[in-house]
Design a protein with these regions (language model features):
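N-terminal helical cap/lid subdomain that shapes the substrate entry/recognition surface
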Residues: 2-120, 134-135
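Asp-based, Mg2+/Mn2+-dependent phosphohydrolase catalytic module
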Residues: 1-16, 44, 111, 115-118, ...
Length: 244
């Protein structure tokens, strides 16, 4: 574990990325997720439909990286002609979420880490670039027993921006009731979205460098973290040092 200096400022809030941070990184077959959906929604054209959804999803993520513009699953489905009000769509979406479930489990370090932060009077936040709804993410947190440990969360599917846009970080700070970004820390696994974005927005940043991020998902700038941790649970010691 390595860290930088804190100056005289204290930490009032710690905001976490979700995928690759609160839940460990998983390398997956992106086409397979949509085959599971399409085989329920339109079995006769599952290969074609899954390819179209994957292409639309890729375009949405690319717009997020290049222009910090958010998107939703609903927009993607509508864009490829899916009837989002149909029973077969709801059944397909359920199959999609079932496929994802093994890849969404919360890191075992998270419950004691979040509880430790809150015991110290530090607010806990989440800021995630996601296409999914708040309801989906809260169901994951509830399943893993950590929903009540989160004071505020912002999902890019609910706002116009994605990380690293400073407005996304501002929204996360507002969600946990912190005015001064210098009194907040962001923890994430992506040097561009998370570390560069947080630093540009005025937060301190902690990198958890465990994710095998594809080159196509890396941004053009890598931020310089204030600390790097070997495991998520080490964040508490970093915050304690900065608050000493």
């Amino acid at each position: 574990m390595s860290g930088g200096t804190s100056g005289h400022r204290t930490v009032d809030a710690v905001v976490f990325d979700w995928g690759g941070t609160l839940t460990p990184w998983h390398t997956i077959d992106l086409r397979e997720q949509w085959l599971h959906y399409a085989e329920v929604y339109d079995p006769a054209h599952a290969d074609e439909l899954s390819a179209r959804i994957l292409s639309a999803e890729d375009a949405a993520w690319r717009a997020g990286r290049e222009h910090q513009r958010s998107a939703t699953l609903d927009q993607i489905f509508r864009g490829v002609g899916v009837d989002v009000d149909s029973d077969r769509h709801r059944d397909g979406l359920a199959a999609y979420h079932r496929w994802w479930e093994p890849h969404t489990h919360t890191d075992p370090d998270v419950p004691p880490l979040l509880a430790g932060l809150r015991d110290r009077g530090i607010k806990v936040g989440v800021l995630s670039n996601t296409l999914s709804t708040r309801e989906h993410h809260e169901a994951v947190f509830r399943r893993d027993g950590v929903l009540d440990l989160v004071d505020g969360a912002v999902y890019s599917s609910e706002i116009p921006w994605t990380k690293p846009h400073p407005h996304a970080f501002r929204a996360a700070l507002d969600a946990v009731g912190v005015d001064d970004p210098a009194r907040a820390v962001f923890v994430g696994d992506r040097p561009f979205d998370d570390i560069h974005g947080a630093k540009e927005a005025g937060l301190r940043a902690v990198l958890v460098p465990h994710s095998a991020i594809p080159d196509s998902q890396k941004g053009h700038v890598e931020g310089e973290p204030d600390a790097v941790v070997d495991r998520l649970g080490d964040v508490l010691a970093v915050v304690d040092r900065w608050n000493a």
